[in-house]
Amino acid sequence: MRRFVPPIEAGTKRQTIRAPRAGRSRHVNVGGEMQLYTAMRTKHCRLIKRVHCAGVSPIKIGVAAGWVEIVGSHDGRAFIIRRQDSLDSFARRDGFADWDDMRQFWRETHPDVDVFSGVLITWVIP
């Protein structure tokens, strides 16, 4: 989405949340190069940035209730984010102004989902 291009270019968006892929296919391996594009599958498609994957972790987001659960990729332990300042910080790392902005986006794009289960992919800029 175009709204995420400026924070990716500025280096403030360093993560993305994706639905899990079917079967054994992965989005990316830790340490692997990622190419971040905008307008995929259109004539306006362009590369935004090349980055390296820093982590891939299962994630659940309680959109209505206001929580995020991330399972650590290195130790398998889950931690839950509930405090407003921590939710705001998480949302900013994903390219949003704050948790309310992120929640509104999720409600508009996934109106029937109260709890989203997917994958959190983080990256570093080489």
Specify the residue positions occupied by each region the protein language model found:
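Catalytic phosphate/metal-binding cores of nucleic-acid and nucleotide-processing enzymes, i.e., regions
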Residues: 1-126
